[in-house]
Amino acid sequence: VSGAVPGFVPRMLVDPDIGLFRADERVFTAMLDGWRAQMLARGLTTQTIKQRCQLLERFQRFTGEFPWQWRPADVDDFLADLRSGEKPISLKTLRSYSNAVAMFCSYLTHPGYGWGEFCERTFGDIPSQICFEWNMPRHTTDDAVPAKKRSFTKAELQRLFDYIDDLVDREYAAGSKRWLPLFRDSVAFKVCYAYGLRRREMTMLDLEDFGPNPHVSDYGRFGAVQVRFAKGTAGSGPRRRTVLTVPEFDWVVDQLKTWTVGGMRQQFPTADRSSALWPSERGARMSLGSFGDAFAAARDAVGLPQELGLHCLRHSYVTHLIEAGYDAAFVQTQVGHSYASTTGLYTSVSSDFKQKTVQQMIARRIANLEDPDA
């Protein structure tokens, strides 16, 4: 059976006729190869696998020792070092790193793969689990969104979009070629807001991703958008979801019509290379970083806080739908959250909305007291 099961000790290591030069390094490499095979068999994405393996290599270099020598204090020192440097990692990243080390140790200590028996015979020591509840960061939903991240107010959004639109008009009037990329960015940011998209989801949109909503014919072919690159879970790769166009954001339909059937998109010389919704000046599709940089430049130009990034448009979508009276379960489905608690973290309703809600509840209670049978 040796070597036939993904992740099992390879035959080359257990063959007594094959000597092990620099045994510790070769065995560690084989362990990573086995873990990689196991994760592939589980259907994880190659990017997730690559990142996890690179982290374990980094951890090994930090300790200067190998898995059968690792102890809980090693992971304590590693994570503490990452949290105390000039650029400390976030709690979310810290949790991801500790989980990766824990999963690797779980793989090594599983009797089905034979690493414990092999290491005891070869090195006189065995791998053990070094990550426990008492030395791993606890997961609480409240730390999923940084404290500085919030929604845009409607006034801030109006100010931002007005600035970008005015900039497009000025560049066009001056005969500058910059007006077209600026117009593309303007439409892209509004689409991002009007559908509550993540940056990658927005960037990866194609023309074919839009379709009609049979129950709302007024929106034509822009009644819904099929999001094909939604955030996956546990390294499973992109998920899909359908986001409906809602009345509060139906102004985006005219924006999309102007961009597509209105011929604006086709003015890019690269437009015919693919069906990407957002072609760039030199390539078939815009990059994630380019949209982020363009948004940051516009935000800084109007003097908005730096913590208001492109992703905050998604927070704003959630908040403004809740303020408009949409059911929380519908909003959760629209943005593709697995848990309602995550949607709750994205919501930062205004004080006016809170006051109106309280006043409505007071008025309802007074009405019930005056007419109990009503």
Say what each PLM segment does.
Residues 1-62, 66-374:
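Conserved catalytic core of the tyrosine transesterase superfamily
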